[in-house]
Amino acid sequence: QPPDAMEHLRMMNRQRAYLDYNATAPLLPAAREAMVAALDMPGNPSSVHAEGRAAREAYSRAREAVARLCGAEAAHVTFTSGATEAASHVLTPDFRMGRAPVRLDTLFIGAAEHPCVIAGGRFDPETVKTLPVDRDGLIDINAVRDAIQAYGAGNNGDGQFMLALQLAN
């Protein structure tokens, strides 16, 4: 008989992270309690009636808790239905850095990424470049160096250096 999920996690080597839960994973008791409480709430957070306002308040508290854990602002926390929706949401060539619009020309991904990442989100498929991985599934660092060298490290128009140089340090 297999051990319960939490016991299985405790038995695993601390040097190894088991990530093959596919669409489910063991829940900590506190997470299970919070989930059951949320499932018992009848309100739609977008509704103005009392149940909706209560659901919106619970949703806001959850967003704030996640933001604290991540060191982010609550307004920057978005809940999605799963990895595919999240990848589609964040893999975009257009975003803002402060108030300034920024456009990325290329998305570099590792060949072992989840199919939703390989799809490239809102990037044009021609601008998604796949980097090879080694036998352990790690991105080949030489391929990263080659990719960085293949693109200008600085912009002669505005004197800005690419983030890749910061990452290299």
Language model: regions and residue ranges:
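Pyridoxal 5′-phosphate
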Residues: 1-169
